[in-house]
Curated annotation (Swiss-Prot):
It comes from Homo sapiens (Human). PROSITE patterns: ACYLTRANSF_C_1, ACYLTRANSF_C_2. The modification N6-succinyllysine is found at residues 69, 85, 239, 424, 439, 510, 544. It is linked to Carnitine palmitoyltransferase 2 deficiency, myopathic, stress-induced: An autosomal recessive disorder of mitochondrial long-chain fatty acid oxidation, characterized by recurrent myoglobinuria, episodes of muscle pain, stiffness, and rhabdomyolysis. These symptoms are exacerbated by prolonged exercise, fasting, cold, or viral infection. CPT2DM affects most frequently children or young adults, and severity of attacks is highly variable. Myoglobinuria can cause kidney failure and death. It is found in: Mitochondrion inner membrane. The lineage of its organism: Eukaryota, Metazoa, Chordata, Craniata, Vertebrata. It is an enzyme of class 2 (transferase). InterPro entries: Carn_acyl_trans, Carn_acyl_trans_N, CAT-like_dom_sf, Cho/carn_acyl_trans, Cho/carn_acyl_trans_2. It is a peripheral membrane protein. Keywords: Acetylation, Acyltransferase, Disease variant, Fatty acid metabolism, Lipid metabolism, Membrane, Mitochondrion, Mitochondrion inner membrane, Transferase, Transit peptide, Transport. Transmembrane segments: none annotated. Inhibited by trans-2-hexadecanoyl-CoA. This is Carnitine O-palmitoyltransferase 2, mitochondrial.
Length: 658
């Protein structure tokens, strides 16, 4: 299984595909066609983005050994050191030189982009649980707008406005502002738009603003991951103008853009959705959507059968739809139900291969569930934030709006699929596998109310470091050991950057965790505070390095990928059990915070692991954890709470309760 990459969210940012038009597609700029009109073209910075650096080999080896230190005993560590030495002076050196040479020949991209696509698209495991994460929206602040039809209409219109704004080049470029008072201003934007694209990044850099890569954005819409034998393909058809809607496992399509590229009137979209919500067709006996949850080779074979049974046109409609809107017929009970429903549901009402599914339950609870190969959390989060803001601040319809009087029976097409016996058998097998797997997944969440970002920053501590330290203490308390831990960090500051790994388990967190968990009475509050400060400093350094492309994980991954591509026998470093162990990420963590996000989550990446989605808010800390039967998520969260209580006690000068 592969490390999950949600992201470490850089605040707001955007991206568009090759040859994307830089100005409106049509004269259709009537009211409500765009959600913003940026004076700086969306892709203005893309050409001048800096390239993702390949770290020096000696730096990578040094960082790798530092990350291994807390996970190994002395004997194991010495062995790993030997493997590293011979790698650095031998085959590793050769591979590194070849990687650097290859990178010089491919200046249009990054050294990680190709191998990363390969890794995702060649993986044969189901995309459900193994790769696809979800992010759930907060409710609309105006409660009557959470009516399912109203919210579905508003979310759909806002999503299409985003699509139009992006393609017209009118979406604000995604920029990380270190000094927004200087760079996030109309004056600066008026100036920078006249700087040629080949130089624009430097102009932003001078005012401490970092434009982010937007190359992933064009795959947000009209895109699907197609199952193929041994390696899947990403398919995009940006000419298609229809939306795919799933309800009760039935498939419907209707156009949301007209022939001139204008958005179909919101009242018509509302009428079509109302028609679909009131359709009394029963759920199909063999729900096709289960197939998207299958092993990729099995699904590839079944898809071929589906095509040759006369379903080619219907599948093309599914694959090319702007996105997939899933309307669920039940309300959400609580946060745990929300997580299960948005992460996997019952398998009948999602097309898991779509670049994203927008899921809306009966009570208006809404989430984005996305396929991960095409893009990372940064692109999805920008879309997410803009859609939330637009749909709540300038909604297209109100709860009182009357749907248009239009004949939806003509406009809305229900897709029917011809199923052979082999396909029916395939769907039944997929359902059985799906149901059995989902039964094994536990999800639980906690909200720690004693404090958050504000308090921790006053204590001069990194809020993220404290959250990560809590996970280390919790695992130590629960299982008595320190294990491989993964935190995703975006490298979108670079052209075609993806993610880098932060390794939160360090000698500092191990020492600090042992002090808090095993012998708190032996240390004064001051000593415990000092250890926390050391952890925070080191975590801050690791985070900065990762964001700057100076981690070790992607570099070692790319060298391994290169060796495999060249048919070179796998170097010993990669056969070392310690390498296997550090990449068996028992704690897989990812943080997301945004005023639009209620919570996010994903499954563990290994069978004996935890999937930890978390957010440190101003005055509270939220944590959403998943596990399989080998681990206890509820108990882990109790240990996380205990760790946070202990740390807050120490910071307030109190003694730790045993």
């Amino acid at each position: 299984m592969v490390p999950r990459l949600l992201l470490r969210a850089w605040p707001r940012g955007p991206a568009v595909g090759p040859g994307a038009p830089s100005r409106p597609l049509s004269a259709g700029s009537g009211p409500g066609q765009y959600l913003q009109r940026s004076i700086v073209p969306t892709m203005h910075y893309q050409d001048s983005l800096p390239r993702l650096p390949i770290p020096k080999l000696e730096d990578t080896i040094r960082r790798y050994l530092s990350a291994q230190k807390p996970l190994l005993n002395d004997g194991q560590f010495r062995k790993t050191e030997q493997f590293c030495k011979s790698f650095e002076n031998g085959i590793g050196k050769e591979l590194h030189e070849q990687l650097v040479a290859l990178d010089k020949q491919n200046k249009h991209t990054s050294y990680i982009s190709g191998p990363w696509f390969d890794m995702y698209l060649s993986a044969r495991d189901s995309v459900v649980l193994n790769f696809n994460p979800f992010m759930a929206f907060n409710p609309d602040p105006k409660s009557e707008y959470n009516d399912q039809l109203t919210r579905a209409t508003n979310m759909t219109v806002s999503a299409i406005r985003f699509l139009k704004t992006l393609r017209a080049g009118l979406l604000e470029p995604e920029v990380f502002h270190l000094n927004p008072a200087k760079s996030d201003t109309i004056t600066f934007k008026r100036l920078i738009r006249f700087v040629p694209s080949s130089l624009s990044w430097y102009g932003a850099y001078l005012v401490n603003a970092y434009p982010l890569d937007m190359s992933q954005y064009f795959r947000l819409f009209n895109s699907t991951r197609l199952p193929k034998p041994s390696r899947d393909e990403l398919f995009t058809d940006d000419k298609a103008r229809h939306l795919l809607v799933l309800r009760k496992g039935n498939f419907y399509i209707f156009d949301v853009l007209d022939q001139d590229g204008n958005i179909v009137s919101p009242s018509e979209i509302q009428a079509h959705l109302k028609y679909i919500l009131s359709d009394s067709s029963p759920a199909p006996e063999f729900p096709l959507a289960y197939l998207t949850s299958e092993n990729r080779d099995i699904w590839a074979e079944l898809r071929q059968k589906l095509m040759s049974s006369g379903n080619e046109e219907s599948l093309r409609k599914v694959d090319s739809a702007v996105f997939c809107l899933c309307l669920d017929d039940f309300p959400i009970k609580d946060l745990v139900h929300l997580s299960h429903n948005m992460l996997h549901g019952d398998g009948t009402n999602r097309w898991f291969d779509k670049s994203f599914n927008l899921i809306i339950a009966k009570d208006g609870s809404t989430a984005v569930h996305f396929e991960h190969s095409w893009g990372d959390g940064v692109a999805v989060l920008r879309f997410f934030n803009e859609v939330f803001k637009d749909s709540t601040q300038t909604p297209a319809v109100t709860p009182q709006s009357q749907p248009a009087t239009t004949d939806s029976t003509v406009t809305v097409q229900k897709l029917n699929f011809e199923l052979t016996d082999a396909l029916k058998t395939g769907i039944t097998a997929a359902k059985e596998k799906f149901d059995a797997t989902m039964k094994t997944l536990t999800i639980d969440c906690v909200q720690f109310q004693r404090g958050g970002k504000e308090f921790l920053k006053k204590q001069k501590l990194s809020p993220d470091a404290v959250a990560q330290l809590a996970f280390q203490m919790a695992f130590l308390r629960q299982y008595g050991q320190t294990v491989a831990t993964y935190e995703s960090c975006s490298t979108a500051a670079f052209k075609h950057g993806r993610t880098e790994t932060i390794r939160p388990a360090s000698v500092y967190t191990k020492r600090c965790s042992e002090a808090f968990v095993r012998e708190p009475s032996r240390h004064s509050a001051g000593e415990l505070q000092q250890m926390m400060v050391e952890c925070s400093k080191y975590h801050g350094q690791l985070t900065k390095e990762a964001a700057m492309g100076q981690g070790f994980d992607r570099h070692l991954f790319a060298l391994r990928h290169l060796a495999a591509a060249k048919g070179i026998i796998l170097p010993e470093l990669y056969l070392d059990p310690a390498y296997g162990q550090i990449n068996h990420n028992v704690l897989s963590t990812s943080t997301l915070s945004s005023p639009a996000v209620n919570l996010g989550g994903f499954a563990p990446v290994v069978s004996d692991g935890f999937g930890v989605g978390y957010a440190v808010h101003d005055n509270w800390i939220g944590c959403n954890v998943s596990s399989y039967p080998g681990r206890n998520a509820r108990e882990f969260l109790q240990c996380v709470e205990k760790a946070l209580e202990d740390m807050f006690d120490a910071l307030e000068g109190k003694s730790i309760k045993s």
